[in-house]
Amino acid sequence: MFLFMAFSVVSVSGHRVLFVREGDSPVGASDPTVILYIALAFSVSLGINVWIFYRVSGGMFNPAVTLALVLGNNMPILRAAMCILAQLVASIAAAGLAQGLLPGPLNAQTTVGNGMTNVEGMFLEMFLTAQLIITIFMLAVEKHKATFLAPLGVGMALFVGHLVGIYYTGASLNPARSFGPAVAAGHFYSDQWVYWAGPFLGSFLAAGFYRLLKFLQYEAANPDQDVDLSCSAREDSNRLACTAERMAIQGKDVPRSTWSRSKDSDVEMGSSIPPKSPQTPIVAVSPNSTDDISGHA
């Protein structure tokens, strides 16, 4: 669905406007309006479909992302192989569907142009893909209180990548994105390898950076990012305890009066503690004693 919507927008943007080689460079790729139009279409389509399918398959539509998850020890190899196969088949189906439904040729193939060599295009694809994958690692793979917004960040990362790469390589960032239209068109450009080598190198770069951050325990550099230090939303009976908890987290000395008042309200460290019931002293009484428990005859 992601690629079908994106390919359709490319076709709507005009035949031979982008991604079509005429001489040595894509035609019309310098038009800012077209660049923004294509970039917005790909990023919004990806963000929406990641949000839809996040609970189903993890919202993965990119073999480079799948490989990076394997390298980051976040996905088994067998499952990754099945995902990559499904992604490639889906890209062919999406390109074929767009070509069959819309009039004229699809014109969604990517190609290196505008004075850029294939090697330069490969490295550009590598860095742009690495940026996208690092965004996925830090927003979706690493769980935090803003994880539910990960699709927005992923979509924006793809948007920026398209702004940079469309003019030079068509901004694939995804082997499946370049493979599907080539199969549907029945023609592979000689630089097709750029759109496999570049994104997969980006997978290694992003996974290596992610594992380095995990090894260095990046959480310690900026701790307590997921701790809610706001007491305004707490109930009145809990605000004293919340204030004491916040001061303790920030390393400040907590006045004894604050803790005592917090305990009086049956709240300690932000959690309710049931009041202790008074204990009745136990007095041992001998069976042969004629005295009562108060000590009087």
What are these regions, as identified by a protein language model?
Residues 1-297:
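Membrane-interface helix-loop junctions and terminal tails of multi-pass membrane proteins
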